[in-house]
């Protein structure tokens, strides 16, 4: 069991390092090519997109990870196949509802919450992700529950590579004076990356379950309804938690630019400042999540299996070590960002005035890192 947790954490950590490096280099290139205004427009759109994705996903990755880890040893692949079919049908129905909301409700919401019309225009290119991401998340949850961390890790790397290459290519292709086109190009690149990662995971999923799928009979309606209860009982609390944070992000994305405009900044200046905050400062601040995110994800199936077998002493050891590693890794990076935030902004992104923002943000950063580890423990339980 310890080897599985260690192996899963190492795979996810290596993947997270690669993803973080690719994402960080991408952010640097985006800021240098397009500036922070286009990044600000996209990041004002993303919370509303994520709100719909969270609802469409309905916590299925965590639910599937936990149920797969619990049932695969005792019930076999047949039961897991029934659960996966139900999960796919559930996210399909939820994605359809969220697509309708994106087309009918969101335009009115943007007109009420944002004075910058470019935000609603940029949102259009993100709509395909409302269907792609939930299906991708279901397959990722299956592999994590089987403690096969390699496939979802490679899938995320494929997604990021496509996003980086397409994003840079589109930015160089559009006019540098057209800020909206650059923002939409970044959104389109993200959707192409999501699609590529989803195709990879689908191929790996069908390959890993080809024998079970061929031998599995058609599932009855009663069987699908029977699986709804455990999936939703685990998924709804996770969704409620994520909705809280996503709604908070959406409110922030609306209030911060509005307050900047009230303070005397123009629409363009407000978008640029918000891009500096969300795209530059937060990129630096999330560096420790390379470890804490990987650790939190790997803890879910490991904690779930230990808790199901009643091994309380081993459970306490896992929790204590995870929190200790989080503290040891996060604190030095927080101090570096507090002291040298301005220097990092000038050296990497060629922007000034980042130091004061980084000093304020670093005070609350430790709770973000610790929260990822603790959430992984609680979701495993």
Q: Model regions: which residues?
A:
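Interfacial/gating helices of multi-pass transporter permease domains
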Residues: 30-51, 179, 183-184, 227-234, ...
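Helix-loop junctions and terminal segments of transmembrane helices
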Residues: 58-73, 285-310, 319, 323
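Short membrane-interface helical motifs at transmembrane helix boundaries
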Residues: 97-115, 120, 332-350
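Alpha-helical transmembrane segments of multi-pass membrane transporters
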Residues: 154-179, 337
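N-terminal membrane topogenesis motif
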Residues: 1-22, 78, 82, 219-245, ...
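Short runs within selected transmembrane alpha-helices of multi-pass transporters and secretion channels
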Residues: 19, 27, 58-65, 125-144, ...
């Amino acid at each position: 069991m310890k080897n599985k947790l260690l192996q899963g954490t190492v795979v996810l950590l290596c993947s997270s390092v690669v993803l973080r490096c690719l994402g960080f280099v991408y952010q640097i290139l985006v800021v240098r090519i397009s500036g922070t205004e286009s990044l600000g427009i996209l990041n004002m759109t993303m919370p509303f997109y994520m709100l719909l994705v969270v609802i469409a996903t309905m916590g299925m990755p965590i639910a599937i990870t936990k149920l797969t880890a619990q049932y695969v040893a005792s019930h076999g692949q047949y039961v897991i196949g029934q659960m996966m079919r139900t999960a796919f049908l559930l996210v399909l129905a939820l994605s359809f509802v969220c697509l309708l909301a994106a087309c009918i409700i969101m335009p009115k919401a943007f007109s009420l919450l944002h004075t910058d019309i470019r935000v609603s225009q940029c949102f259009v290119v993100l709509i395909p992700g409302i269907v792609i991401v939930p299906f991708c998340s279901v397959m990722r949850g299956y592999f994590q529950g089987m403690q096969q961390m390699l496939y979802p890790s490679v899938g995320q790397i494929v997604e990021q590579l496509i996003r980086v290459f397409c994003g840079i290519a589109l930015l160089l292709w559009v006019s540098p004076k057209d800020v909206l086109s650059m923002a939409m190009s970044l959104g389109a690149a993200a959707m192409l990356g999501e699609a590529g990662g989803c195709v990879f995971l689908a191929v790996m999923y069908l390959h890993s379950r080809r024998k079970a799928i061929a031998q599995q009979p058609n599932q009855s309606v009663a069987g699908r309804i029977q699986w709804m209860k455990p999936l939703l009982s685990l998924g709804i609390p996770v969704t409620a938690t994520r909705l809280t944070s996503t709604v908070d992000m959406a409110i922030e994305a609306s209030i911060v630019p509005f307050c900047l405009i009230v303070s005397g900044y123009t629409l363009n200046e407000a978008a640029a400042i918000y891009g500096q905050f969300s795209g530059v400062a937060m990129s630096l601040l999330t560096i420790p999540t390379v470890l804490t995110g990987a650790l939190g994800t790997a803890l879910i199936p490991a904690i779930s299996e230990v808790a199901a077998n009643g091994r309380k002493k081993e459970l306490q050891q896992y929790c204590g070590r995870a929190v200790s590693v989080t503290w040891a890794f996060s604190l030095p990076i927080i101090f570096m960002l507090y002291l040298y935030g301005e220097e990092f902004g000038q050296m990497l992104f060629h922007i000034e005035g980042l130091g004061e923002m980084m000093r304020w943000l670093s005070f609350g950063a430790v709770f973000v890192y610790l929260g990822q580890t603790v959430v992984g423990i609680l979701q495993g339980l």
